[in-house]
Amino acid sequence: MADCAACHTGAGGTLSGGRAFKSPFGTIYATNITPDKTKGVGDYTDDEWVSALREGVGRGGKHLYPAMPYTSYTQMTREDALAIKAYVMTLPASSDAPPPNDLRFPFSIRFLMVFWNFLYNPDHRFAPDTTHDAAWNRGAYLAEALGHCQQCHTPRNFLQGLKTGQAYAGALQQGWMAYNITSDGPTGIGSWSEADVAAYLRTGHAEGHGAASGPMAEAVSYSLRYLTEADAQALARYVKSIQPIRTTVLPAPTHVAEDELGARIFEGACASCHRANGTGAQSAAAALAGDYTAADPDATNLVQIVVNGGKLQTQDGALVMPGFGDGYTDTELAAVANYTVEHFGQRAGHASPGLVAKARGSATPKVEQPGA
């Protein structure tokens, strides 16, 4: 549930590190957290491990950067933190060393994190809300601590601190839009049932709402698909209780002119899997009708998927969407993205060749996801 593998898995294997994360201040590389005693965390004491997870301070007082979600893990119990450590120590060790971080001055000075932590890391444990029952509190703990959901779904300020007053209202992360998951109807998941949310978490798909892609697909593949039914229901219950925050409302569906170039490309490259009517040929996850991403005029996530593809690993096997970045021009891919929004969302798409070019540039090296 803590989803360590999604960030720390690299070319050297599970938790070997090396994955790059771009920030406004430069690039941060995930560390090796395998049991290797030289390059990894094999000789960390329990106290050092817990300090790193909950306080963002590693061995020798070395401050971590908040690409590591310790501002959420700070709510984790010591028992859960040490359970993660016990599991990590059973995995194969790797001697891989990630590249050094490439951060601009003065952000390269780790000591400055003392002041950042003073502002943005509360360093407190999860406290149950006695006005709610045990299931709701279990869901709150999973979302706020272990699952660190706010780290992607809450917008950040200019110092990259979470804007807690806009919790779960959606944010752009690594070139992908983490959508509004508050209970707002038009712009959040107010129309989703708790069963829809639970199914989405465990399978990466909710009928009539769409399939997970990008970082959310990784979260499902590496972590959320292993949720027990009870935990998925608890998490869904908590998420559905989040106070609504209204963000940008999608335009009302209307008849719009469809991109002719995009229509031709869709027929030749997309319809065999997604079908012309968007119902999906081989899997419900391939359905475009009703999919929020396919109806979003900004087309941020849609363009990422079209250019770079994606993979969703479920308990029943892998669902793979190939990327088309190598076979089509920026203009052609923008056209097919706009056609998709226009045809299935009945809204004018705003994908541009520039957005496609940006998606090409944001692609990260593919790391093989776990098997079923």
Feature locations, PLM:
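Mature N-terminal segment immediately following signal peptide/propeptide cleavage
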Residues: 1-9
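Short cysteine-rich clusters marking metal-coordination/redox-active sites
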Residues: 4, 149, 270
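Flexible coil segments in periplasmic/lumen-exposed cytochrome c-class electron-transfer proteins
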Residues: 10-27, 59-140, 144-145, 154-176, ...
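Acidic/histidine-rich, surface-exposed loop or edge segments in extracytoplasmic proteins
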Residues: 28-35, 176-182
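Short, recurring structural edge motifs at helix starts
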Residues: 37-39, 72, 183-187, 221-224, ...
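Aromatic- and charge-enriched surface segment that lines or borders ligand/interaction sites
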Residues: 41-57, 61, 83, 190-194
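Extended, polar beta-sheet/loop recognition surfaces of beta-rich domains
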Residues: 201, 205, 289-332
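C-terminal structural cap/anchor segments
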Residues: 261-300, 304
